[in-house]
């Protein structure tokens, strides 16, 4: 991949290097990405007839997360739909895909949190696919072009699905938020839902969001 050091950026109709401005979301590529996703959804549905809706959130940089609503004529159909998408062209670079109910608005991230909180059993509904294809630019991959993928089944089980006969899911005690805040290195802890605790940490020697790590990378 070429490396360019720019001193000034201008624009014209016949650009020397046509490109979008990327960086910490939201940026120009974010809105273009959502528009492209909406435009190509009918094409995807022609090849994958179970797909009802698909959304790659800007907040996760597109290739890190996909939310797919699937038809549900038989048990675990959402999982089958999600697995099919993981082999569909550039979607093979996805890291995480979440299957949701047919009536779920895939662009409503609050509804996604509700589904993850109320319908996902960690022991049964998280499927890890080890050693799958990764993007060459994926910074978190342990090896070049290889990483694990995660499929989350956040659909409501059908009556014929053994998942539908399990006990109702339980949340975490509110005291856990206070306990987590007291852990060394934890700056902030907050419940997003009754079973979802998010913590902000500070790693000693780690870069701040305002710091440029380019020189450190070159030295390494």
Functional labels for PLM-detected ranges:
Residues 1-220:
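Charged, compositionally biased interaction regions
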């Amino acid at each position: 991949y070429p490396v360019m050091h720019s001193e000034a950026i201008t624009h014209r109709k016949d650009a020397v290097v046509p490109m979008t401005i990327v960086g910490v979301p939201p940026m120009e590529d974010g809105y273009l990405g959502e528009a492209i996703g909406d435009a190509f959804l009918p094409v995807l549905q022609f090849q994958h007839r179970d797909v009802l809706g698909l959304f790659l959130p800007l907040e996760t940089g597109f290739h890190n997360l996909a939310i797919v609503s699937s038809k549900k004529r038989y048990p675990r159909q959402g999982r089958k739909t999600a697995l099919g998408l993981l082999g569909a062209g550039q979607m093979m670079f996805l890291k995480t895909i979440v299957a949701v109910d047919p009536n779920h608005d895939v662009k409503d991230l609050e509804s996604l949190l509700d589904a993850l909180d109320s319908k996902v059993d960690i022991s049964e509904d998280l499927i890890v696919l080890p050693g799958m294809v990764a993007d060459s630019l994926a910074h978190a991959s342990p090896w070049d072009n290889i990483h694990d993928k995660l499929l989350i089944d956040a659909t409501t089980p059908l009556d014929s699905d053994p998942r539908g006969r399990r006990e109702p899911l339980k949340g975490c005690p509110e005291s856990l938020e206070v306990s987590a805040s007291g852990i060394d290195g934890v700056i902030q802890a907050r419940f997003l839902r009754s079973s979802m605790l998010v913590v902000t940490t500070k790693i000693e020697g780690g870069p701040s969001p305002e710091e440029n790590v380019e020189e450190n990378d070159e030295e390494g």
